[in-house]
Design a protein with these regions (language model features):
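Hydrophobic, Leu/Ile/Phe/Ala-enriched alpha-helical segments that form helix-helix packing faces
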Residues: 4-9, 16, 90, 143-150
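Flexible, charged surface loops at secondary-structure boundaries
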Residues: 25-26, 66-71, 119-123
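Short hydrophobic beta-strand segments
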Residues: 72-78, 125-130
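Catalytic phosphate/metal-binding cores of nucleic-acid and nucleotide-processing enzymes, i.e., regions
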Residues: 54-68, 77, 81-106, 111-112
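Basic, glycine-enriched DNA-binding surface that flanks or lies within the catalytic cores of DNA
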Residues: 1-59, 210
Length: 211
């Protein structure tokens, strides 16, 4: 887990908070987001003014209304706070509640999370909100691979991302690395849409804090 300093959830628009409040517990000024795995295990993300703790856990924090088959857009993120901060910037995604689902995967996304969400929301287009840095961009690629029942190894050497995929090796400059560039290199097509904050911000949470 890692600490971040920010103004906290009180600065969020009430309409955004209303959409998610059924999946948020509040203790004083702290927002708690409960993650759960398929075995019933739980972990908690904490967000308040001056503190943000995100679990490394195999479960998810999941929000949607209606039946999973109705969902047309599934948004994936490392943290619930990032999801709320994204929706603060793009509240239009909340106008048709049964149309969208949001899942926070914690610091370390896993193949089991990707498979579970693919099965649950079989009709949904996937959107990712992972960090703009290299870790987030690699996570975009891992989600695409896992949803296709595949995997690859990623390694950074100097200014190059070295990829081992289906016994072949590929090299992409760190500065140019993205899901699109990866898919083009290895001939994979996921139809995943990646969302990154504008400017030099690393995440939607960071954008929310600093603007």
């Amino acid at each position: 887990m890692f600490p971040l300093t920010d103004t906290g959830p009180p600065a969020l628009d009430p309409g955004v908070l209303a959409f998610f409040m059924n999946r948020i517990a509040v203790q004083g000024q702290v927002f708690l987001f409960s993650y759960q795995d398929q075995q019933g295990g739980t972990a908690t993300e904490y967000w308040s003014s001056g503190l943000h703790l995100v679990p490394a856990f195999a479960g998810t924090w999941l929000v949607h209304e209606g039946f999973p088959a109705q969902v047309r857009h599934l948004f994936l993120s490392h943290s619930a706070a990032d999801i709320l901060c994204f929706c603060q910037l793009r509240p239009d995604w909340l106008t048709v509640p049964g149309n969208v689902a949001f899942a926070a995967l914690g610091l370390l996304a896993t193949a089991s999370q990707a498979r579970f969400l693919k099965e649950r929301f079989a009709n949904a287009k996937v959107h990712t909100l992972f960090d703009a840095g290299l870790t987030g961009r690699v996570t975009d690629c891992k989600i695409a691979l896992w949803r296709a029942g595949k995997d690859a190894a990623f390694r950074v050497m100097d200014d190059t991302v070295q990829i081992t995929y289906r016994r072949r090796k590929f090299n992409i400059p760190v500065s140019a690395f993205s899901l699109h560039r990866f898919e083009k290199a290895v001939a994979l097509r996921s139809n995943i849409r990646t969302h990154k904050p504008k400017g030099c911000f690393g995440s939607y949470h960071e954008f929310f804090v600093d603007t």
